[in-house]
Amino acid sequence: MRRPFASSAAGTAGVRVTAQTTDQDRLPDTGASYGQRVALYFAAMFVIYGVLIPFLPVWLDGRGLTANEVAIVTAVPFILRLAVTPAVAIFADRLGAHRLFIIASAWAAFAACLLLGGMNGFWPILAVAAPLSLAAATMMPLVEAIAVKGVRVYALDYGRMRLWGSLSFVIVGLIVGAWIDRSGSEAALWIMLVGTMLTVVAAHALPYPPAATRDEETSNAPAASTITRDVLRLFSLPVFCAFLVAASAAQASHAMFYTFGALHMRAQGISGAWIGALWAIGVLAEVALFAVAGTRFRHLQPETLLAMGAAAAILRWMVMTIDPPLQILVPLQLLHALTYGATHLGAILFVARAVPERVSGTVQALYATFASGVAMGAATWASGPL
């Protein structure tokens, strides 16, 4: 695949997004620590996601919101990302302050989660749940930029860092599902509060930029006009636009399942424990993909991974339309490894190969904005009446 930018940092081979650095370029004795702290943050952050994605609709339903109101509360943060996520990413790239913005977002999520427990009724819940979801979503592209920095400087394996987030999601899903069966939907909020606290701690433990690049980033930080010009140049390239459309469509196909999947399965008589287990099965499949991607898929191109994700999504959601029994839901959930995992890996690999490092965070945010903002928000909003 040709690079849109001739000046972009050295690309990587295969899905194991590894940098082509020499031994002289690498910084000794710090790469492992860098990767461990990023992995720790992924694990903490995904405690929030492990409640927010599958079980926030269950909590909203328990607070008496209608299906349309649940869809709106879930969709509004996606829409707000259109402005907030790119703006934060541009400032983070301009200032070289991804870590600082992550810390601020983590504290905002913690404060919103504290307030949410006292909210009742559609408007008060929307006023607090939307900032909570937005803060949680804003953290993802910022920490992805930090992870990609580790890939480029220390030749770290992105999948090995990211899989700890997926494992955290699995464990939390199992705990929340079982706890809801015993104690009701309010249990979800308590675990999410713990998740926000852990995320605050992990955010403060995130690594600073590698020493070899910190001074360079400070002295040669791109002007906002330079970042804007680079981003506009990307949008003029058909390959970048095709990437955004493909990745966004594949990710948005999950919208109705994320919003109403748990509620629909409960209506079918599936227990909370089994709902948590089904989510766990899907994410474990994703973990397995991340774990082997660096060795098994190293020769695959980003577009191949995106095509695999899209094809699996067509099969998965077509079968889901017939309300399959539990024994069919289990293998269907295994397809999550492709519908989400392969799509996401393809997107991360595309960014690592095709864009300059100076706008990496901004492009990560653009991907998140279009995939998890425009496309996911529209699909989520539409799922309410359906």
Set out the residue ranges of the language-model regions.
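Helix-to-loop junctions at the C-terminal end of transmembrane segments
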Residues: 83-97, 180-181, 288-302
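Juxtamembrane intracellular "pre-TM" segments in multi-pass secondary transporters
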Residues: 21-33, 207-246
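Hydrophobic core of transmembrane alpha-helices in multi-pass small-molecule transporters
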Residues: 43, 112-116, 122-141, 146, ...
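Intracellular juxtamembrane helix-capping segments at the cytosolic ends
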Residues: 137-152, 342-356
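Structural signature of the two symmetry-related core transmembrane helices
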Residues: 100-114, 304-319
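Loop-to-transmembrane helix entry/capping segments in MFS-fold secondary transporters
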Residues: 67-68, 152-164, 272-273, 355-368
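Helix-loop boundary and gating motifs at the non-cytosolic
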Residues: 25-78, 239-278, 344
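Symmetry-related core transmembrane helices of the 12-TM Major Facilitator Superfamily/SLC fold
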Residues: 187-205
